[in-house]
């Protein structure tokens, strides 16, 4: 059996650590009210342990460092306050 959970990501400078079940597949991102979330699917067949996952959030027009030896995977874009705040979520891989 599988399930989907949402995990809150609080936009801030730097890396955001979120504990997720091992092997969780990130499905999408979005905003609800004043919060940004990612949704992830994972198996509930085992007693799945958690692992840290690392995310970064950048606003439109903000600088994204590229010379740090870090690989990032784009997860999605979240719109807040009727689109006046736009966040782009990346996972460090």
Protein language model regions, located:
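Catalytic phosphate/metal-binding cores of nucleic-acid and nucleotide-processing enzymes, i.e., regions
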Residues: 1-93
């Amino acid at each position: 059996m599988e399930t989907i959970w949402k995990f809150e990501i609080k936009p801030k400078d730097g890396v955001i650590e979120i504990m997720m079940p091992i092997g969780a597949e990130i499905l999408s991102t979005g905003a609800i009210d004043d919060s940004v979330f990612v949704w992830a699917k994972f198996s509930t067949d085992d007693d799945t342990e958690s692992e840290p996952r690392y995310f970064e959030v950048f606003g439109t027009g903000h600088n994204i460092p590229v010379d740090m030896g870090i690989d990032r995977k784009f997860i999605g874009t979240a719109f807040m306050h009727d689109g006046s705040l736009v966040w782009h979520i990346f996972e460090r891989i």
